[in-house]
């Protein structure tokens, strides 16, 4: 059975790249262009990993993650944030969210694959 991934990103180019990289890695990929839709999909599909932009049109990625962490069905899903803010302020926003990490933009395909692999191994 394929592992499931959810990509939440409002930038169509980033969404497509992340989706393609995950599909090549063998994931069934679900997509959302905002946090509210992403939260709904996460609750329904229970993906093995969530890739989420830090800045979404309807709420911050950290806020969406906190909502997911409060739900017993989604609280343990690893979340990898994608952000252009790899400086201290960007890390600060997500550092207290359990079972999460980040990938900087622009996305390096090798780093992306390595980070996803690390989170899937930890979750297994």
Language model: regions and residue ranges:
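Charged docking surfaces used in two-component/phosphorelay signaling
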Residues: 16-24
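Active-site beta3 strand of CheY-like receiver
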Residues: 45-51, 56
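Acidic catalytic/metal-coordinating carboxylates
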Residues: 13, 33-37, 60-66
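Short amphipathic alpha-helix used as the core "switch/output" element in two-component signaling
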Residues: 40, 62-75
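The feature encodes the CheY-like receiver
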Residues: 15, 57, 75, 87
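Short hydrophobic/Thr-rich beta-strand motif most characteristic of the beta2 strand and flanking loop
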Residues: 26-33, 41
């Amino acid at each position: 059975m394929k592992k499931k991934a959810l990509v939440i990103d409002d930038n169509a180019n980033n969404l497509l790249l992340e989706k393609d990289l995950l599909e090549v890695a063998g994931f069934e990929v679900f997509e959302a262009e905002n946090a509210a839709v992403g939260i709904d999909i996460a609750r329904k599909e229970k993906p093995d990993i969530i890739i989420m932009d830090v800045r979404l049109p309807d709420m911050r990625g950290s806020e969406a993650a906190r909502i997911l962490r409060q739900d017993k069905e989604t609280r343990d899903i690893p979340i990898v944030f994608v952000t252009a803010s790899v400086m201290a302020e960007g890390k600060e926003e997500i550092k207290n969210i359990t079972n999460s990490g980040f990938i900087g933009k622009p996305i390096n395909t090798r780093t992306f694959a390595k980070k996803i692999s690390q989170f899937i191994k930890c979750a297994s």
